[in-house]
A protein has these predicted regions:
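Binuclear metal-dependent phosphoesterase catalytic core
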Residues: 118-158
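Acidic, His/Gly-enriched loop-helix segments that form or flank divalent-metal centers
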Residues: 2, 6-124, 128-135
Length: 158
């Protein structure tokens, strides 16, 4: 869901391009997918970090603003949308999140990085790659706030 199937298919296509014999391909694929699964399963649901004396929370979808960070439910961290980015959260932290393609948040329906203009402590970075050709990969350097963008159309043209 939400791009996971496409990711797995891209991995399969990559492995097929290596021109492995079928039995070798199957072994390599199974080992790779098992390692990928274990890696993803063991990732934290959120990361707290401090960069240049500014506290950040990196989270897939967001948090329940009515709960403490330690009291969040896994489903909320992975699936919440509007209630998170439309609500006030701990103003001493900046929340960087994905999951919701920015064309559904930005007033201009772009995939550009979204900055919360009401509470000033949320940054959306989901450039909508799961939506196809219009999408882009958004990255932010937390040291200086510089934004880097790689548009899907530019990758396909290369």
């Amino acid at each position: 869901q939400n791009g996971g199937e496409k990711t797995i298919e891209n991995i399969r296509q990559y492995l097929r391009k290596k021109k492995l014999y079928h039995c070798d391909y199957t072994i390599v694929r199974n080992i790779f997918l098992r390692n990928l699964y274990n890696y993803l399963k063991n990732l934290p649901l959120y990361i707290e970090l401090n960069v240049n004396n500014k506290d950040y929370i990196l989270v897939h979808a967001g948090i329940d603003p009515e709960r403490t960070l330690d009291d969040q439910e896994e489903d909320t961290l992975l699936w919440i949308r509007d209630y998170f980015f439309l609500s006030e959260c701990d103003l001493n932290k900046t929340y960087i999140f994905g999951h919701t393609p920015l064309c559904f948040i930005n007033r201009d329906q772009s995939f550009n990085v979204w900055y919360d203009d009401e509470f000033h402590n949320k940054i959306g970075i989901d450039g909508g790659l799961a939506l196809g050709e219009r999408g882009q990969l958004n990255c932010i350097c937390l040291d200086d706030g510089q934004v880097f963008v790689l548009k899907m159309s530019e990758v396909n043209d290369a």
